[in-house]
Regions:
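C-terminal substrate-recognition "lid" of short-chain dehydrogenase/reductases
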Residues: 126, 210-238, 243
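Short C-terminal tail/terminal secondary-structure segment
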Residues: 232-267
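Canonical Rossmann dinucleotide-binding motif of NAD(H)/NADP(H)-dependent dehydrogenases/reductases
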Residues: 3-36
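Short, small/polar-rich loop/turn modules that mediate ligand/substrate recognition or access, typified
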Residues: 170, 175, 231-233
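Alpha-helical segment proximal to the catalytic Tyr-Lys
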Residues: 125, 167-171
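Active-site helix of classical SDR
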Residues: 120, 154, 162
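Substrate-binding pocket helix/loop in short-chain dehydrogenase/reductase
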Residues: 96-97, 101-107, 198, 202
Length: 267
């Protein structure tokens, strides 16, 4: 059966977590006919998902440029080209503004700004016949979430880099877009979402009445990378309308729910 991404080579960074958003995208892209290279830090998990989707893998620490370049080179060596680069790593750093440490600020800048920036720098020269860059961002790049200033700032910053890429490389047939989920049901968030009242506190702010899933994000990514898409430089808000409203404020939810929110990792 013909798929929307037949024979496109997709490199998905951030696909080492069991059933995380990157792995869900890898499965969906493979179903659409793409050739998959998954990347991340957990080699055992990468082996498992790459075997499942009939693809390959590369171990990569996004904070180290030599790992990023080696990963991209491996994808090109395996398939002779690169059509799609997806950046799905992140760290949901939570801290009151005045309490953010220099060490943590350097860490989140490396994970959510410098690393993705260098990933895009590595992918673009390999896209000889055009291609697609996708950044998994966050609704919090647009609307507030208490005690997440550094997280929100780095997400918003890399969104602007995406627009810059779209502007500078459009004439080479390269499109660049970002996707902004809100709170998303994943294995990583399952423990926190089990806290009494947490899901309801968030869900009431979603006009569509439910929390998002990784499958929602994967479907949007397939569209953005398909030949039928004419979007570039856009931030796709895949969050059920959350950005029409707001995230719950910390004082509006009880202590047990607030503690669970504090454990959530970002997209």
């Amino acid at each position: 059966m013909s798929g929307k991404l037949n024979n496109k080579v997709a490199l998905i960074l951030g696909a080492a977590g069991k059933d995380n958003m990157g792995q869900v995208m890898a499965r969906r892209f493979a179903q659409e006919g793409a050739k998959i290279v998954v990347a991340g830090r957990n080699e055992d998990s990468l082996k498992e998902i790459s075997s499942e989707v009939g693809g390959d893998y590369a171990v990569c620490d996004i904070t180290k440029k030599e790992y990023i370049d080696a990963m991209t080179s491996k994808a090109v060596d395996l398939h002779g080209k690169l059509d799609i680069g997806i950046q799905a790593t992140g760290w949901g750093y939570l801290s009151p503004f005045l309490e953010s440490t220099e060490e943590d600020l350097v860490k989140i800048m490396n994970l959510q700004f410098k690393g993705p920036y260098q990933f895009f720098q590595s992918c673009i020269p390999a896209m000889k016949e055009g291609g697609n860059i996708i950044q998994i961002s966050s609704a919090t790049a647009t609307i507030m979430l208490d005690n997440h200033a550094a997280y929100m700032g780095t997400k918003a910053g890399i969104d602007h880099v995406i627009r810059t890429i779209a502007n500078e490389f459009g004439e080479k047939g390269i499109r660049a877009n970002s996707i902004s989920p809100g709170l998303t049901a994943t294995p990583m968030t399952s423990d926190a979402m089990a806290a009494p009242g947490l899901e309801d506190a968030f869900k009431k702010e979603y006009p569509l009445g439910r929390i998002g899933t990784s499958e929602d994000v994967a479907a949007a990514a397939v569209f953005l990378c398909s030949d039928e898409c004419f979007l570039s430089g856009q931030n796709l808000q895949v969050n059920g309308g959350l950005t029409l409203r707001r995230n719950p404020r910390s004082h509006e939810i009880d202590a047990s729910v607030a503690a669970a929110v504090a454990k959530l990792e970002g997209n």
